[in-house]
Amino acid sequence: MLILRFVYPRATPERRRALMHWWSRKLLAILNITPQVEGAAPAAGETQAMIVANHVSWIDIFLISSVRPTRFVAKSEIRAWPLAGWIAERAGTLFIRRDQMRDMARIDARVREVLQEGDCVGLFPEGITTEGDELLKFHTSLFEPAVANGAHVHPAAIRYEHPDGTLCRQMSFIGDRTFMESIELILGQKSVRARIMFAPPVDTAGAARRDVAKRVEASVASLLGLEPRGRAPSTPGDR
């Protein structure tokens, strides 16, 4: 915590990425979560990279950053979460009010800047979390910076499992479950395998954002062995 509070804000971009990578791996170990990477994640030196994944838990951002340090676009409500919100803010998360078109434009510009600075950007385009047994329709609006910058979009699927391979629903952060209840459920597990599966990157050159979103969504669904079963609430940027 002291590192995030005092060292991280003053560190160089390269040092920040190293610290986020270290902290994410440390947190997973503390929670008895073992990451299992399948497929090829964005290489450490790859620029203009974006990771797009399904969303199950607040742990997702640390799972992804344990593989490749990443700055995430996340709903503004996360900033108010105990501990996780503070950590996310310190780690450079880009918070967005999805119900306000002006904020969508601000985040669009900021994501472009972050990509151009060489940081990897992470998106959870379902907009809400699930238990991991379904995939909601992807919002398309936040794919625009990737298309504008010709970024490589890496589809990723997240699945939390018990040691026997069954879905660990206790990892999900859904409904009325509070952050403290989520912590208690996670700590109640002897061990959890966190699978993060990567599909080949989607080239955005000359593509429309809706086409990119559709291709990425299909890749994530395939990795999970699922089909999209619903639609996340619409936002102004999707219209």
Residue ranges and their predicted role:
Residues 48-50, 93, 120-124, 152, ...:
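Residue-level preference for the first positions of well-ordered beta-strands
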Residues 94-115, 120, 218:
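A membrane-cytosol interface segment of integral membrane proteins
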Residues 114-143:
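Catalytic-site beta-strand/loop segments enriched in glycine and acidic/polar residues
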